[in-house]
Amino acid sequence: MSFRALTMRSAVARTALNNTIRSARVATPYLGIRHSSSTPTPDPKTKAASLIDALPGNTALTKTGILGTSAAAIIYGISNQLYVINDESILLLIFLGFSGLVAKFLAPLYKDFADARIKKIGSILNSSRERHVDAVKDRIESVSELQNVSETTKVLFDVSKETVELEAKAFELKQKVELAHEAKSVLDSWVRYEASLRQLQQKQIAEGIISKVESELTNPKFQDRVLQQSIAEVEQVLANIK
């Protein structure tokens, strides 16, 4: 019973495989005609080499072993009806082929874009790091210049203290000068007052003497006495001359 089932399965698998091969043979000339009409037919050796290179593995033996094992597994699965080719299988193959094409053609472009992006970001980070390092160095230099800030502050404090003392002395001298100037002005005003008072007194004395002399000159007795004295002096002079 089991042998008959295996025989029937083998017959069904051979029939399905023959139908697939026949349909592939029918479709192959049509595809070949369309391909030849649009582009020249590529070299089979080159195409086979590209397919082998697309397989995973490092050596040709490994890639050939993977290809043979995969083909044997597919044939075994189809012959034992473990896997039946249907519409979903065709869609899966088309999707896998499209994914392979995308991985083959778009992966290098994406790799170039990613490398350029990484390089740009790396350059930005490097420039930022260099600027940060320069800023830190400048800060260190500015701080190192202030390492003697205590001594400088002490000197500045001494200078400011001396400046305050000099300003205090200058203010004191200024006050003394202003006081002396004020005292001098007071003394000058007092001297001027005394001089004016003395002049007034002298004027009053002179006026008193002049008025007294004038009053005496108007006195007849004084005039007679002066006249007699003058006559006596003249007579004496004449006597001396003789």
Curated annotation (Swiss-Prot):
One of its GO terms (cellular component) is mitochondrial inner membrane. Its main location: mitochondrion. Keywords: CF(0), Hydrogen ion transport, Ion transport, Membrane, Mitochondrion, Mitochondrion inner membrane, Transit peptide, Transport. One of its GO terms (molecular function) is proton-transporting ATP synthase activity, rotational mechanism. Pfam families: Mt_ATP-synt_B (PF05405). Residues 1-35 form a transit peptide. It is found in: Mitochondrion; Mitochondrion inner membrane. GO terms for biological process: protein-containing complex assembly. The keyword Transit peptide applies. The keyword Ion transport applies. Belongs to the eukaryotic ATPase B chain family. F-type ATPases have 2 components, CF(1) - the catalytic core - and CF(0) - the membrane proton channel. In yeast, the dimeric form of ATP synthase consists of 17 polypeptides: alpha, beta, gamma, delta, epsilon, 4 (B), 5 (OSCP), 6 (A), 8, 9 (C), d, E (Tim11), f, g, h, i/j and k. PANTHER family: ATP SYNTHASE F(0) COMPLEX SUBUNIT B1, MITOCHONDRIAL (PTHR12733:SF3), MITOCHONDRIAL ATP SYNTHASE B CHAIN (PTHR12733). Mitochondrial membrane ATP synthase (F(1)F(0) ATP synthase or Complex V) produces ATP from ADP in the presence of a proton gradient across the membrane which is generated by electron transport complexes of the respiratory chain. F-type ATPases consist of two structural domains, F(1) - containing the extramembraneous catalytic core, and F(0) - containing the membrane proton channel, linked together by a central stalk and a peripheral stalk. During catalysis, ATP synthesis in the catalytic domain of F(1) is coupled via a rotary mechanism of the central stalk subunits to proton translocation. This is ATP synthase subunit 4, mitochondrial. It comes from Candida glabrata (strain ATCC 2001 / BCRC 20586 / JCM 3761 / NBRC 0622 / NRRL Y-65 / CBS 138).
